[in-house]
Amino acid sequence: MSNNTKYIFLSPHLDDAIFSCGDYISKLTSEGEIVLVITIFSGYPLSQQLQPSAKQFHKLCNLGKYPIEERKKEDRLACERLQCDFRHLSYYEYLYRKDRNGNFLYRHIYSELKNEDTLKNDIIKELLMHLDDKCVVYCPLSLGDHVDHVFVNSIGRALEFMRYKVIYYEDFPCVSDSSMVSYMGKTK
């Protein structure tokens, strides 16, 4: 039964934590533990023009004009099935984020992380509303170098610096066996 620990999984996008840690989340909830999945980047810019890479991504994934609502519905259903709670934060993923001048910050998935301290601080403030001294935070390792996963990993490191217990998970499918081997320095 529950030991009053709350397990919080930070998910860069809808389905990332479920896809990567669903079996463990299921184990925790079946044992009566409190689990909360917080998706950081689940906002969608309804009024802005999309950059070419976003249009290409939408077409490749056969996403409609406003894909986020269907994806949120799928995520809610997955969380219900796993018997965990969820929060969808309204921040934009890399495809939609712009700088102060209205220019897109990132052109592709593996872009170098920009200085987005204001965004990072806003997200941390929102996360702190869900954290206490008994929680365990699970955060992506970001081994696949997806810019949003790297960003959320930096949030995990900031929470760790603030003395929260943070455990890092392999963010599947961003990491594959070959990228893990390469990351570990064991390439041929």
PLM region spans:
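Short, flexible loop segments at boundaries between secondary-structure elements
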Residues: 161-186
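Active-site beta-strand->loop->alpha-helix modules in alpha/beta enzyme cores, enriched
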Residues: 1-151, 158
